[in-house]
Amino acid sequence: MSDKIGLFTGSFDPMTNGHLDIIERASRLFDKLYVGIFFNPHKQGFLPIENRKRGLEKAVKHLGNVKVVSSHDELVVDVAKRLGATCLVRGLRNASDLQYEASFDYYNHQLSPDIETIYLHSRPEHLYISSSGVRELLKFGQDIACYVPESILEEIRNEKKD
C-alpha cells in the first residue's frame, strides 16, 4: 500500500498560529505532508519567500512527516502530481473562505480529478487570525507574538534589521 501524501499550500506571508494548527492537525492524517509556499501574484509580498520558508521549516521541525517546499510558477495540482500528493488540504475560518476555496476546488478537480481536497476548520482561538491582519498590526508597530510562531517572529525581526 502506498503512502498517503497531502499538500497544504498558501502564501504564508507571514505564517500564523492558525496555519501551524492546520499543519499539525493535517500531519496526523497523512504519512507525508508537504507544505507548499506559493507566490500569490494577487498579493503584495511582505516577507521574501526564502524567509517564509526558513521560518516555516523551523516552526514545523517537530513534525517528522512534514516537508516545506516552495513554488513560483506552477499550479497547485501540478505540484501535487509532482510530489505524489493525492489530497489537497485547505484551512477554513468562515463561509467566505469556503466560497473562495470552492472555486479553486472546481478548477483543481477539472484539471486533476484524482486529487481530492479536504477542509479543516480553524479552531475557535484562530478564527480571526489572518496574515493580512498580522501585517496590518506590524504596520502600526503592534506586538504580534501571540499570532505567529516564534520562528516567524525571528524572520520578521531579521528582515526589519536589513
Curated annotation (Swiss-Prot):
E.C. code: 2.7.7.3
SUPFAM superfamilies cross-referenced by the UniProt entry: Nucleotidylyl transferase
InterPro entries membership: Cyt_trans-like, PPAT, Rossmann-like_a/b/a_fold
Cofactor: Mg(2+)
GO cellular component: cytoplasm
Transmembrane segments: none
Job of this protein: Reversibly transfers an adenylyl group from ATP to 4'-phosphopantetheine, yielding dephospho-CoA (dPCoA) and pyrophosphate.
Name this protein carries in UniProt: Phosphopantetheine adenylyltransferase
Lineage: Bacteria, Bacillati, Bacillota, Bacilli, Lactobacillales
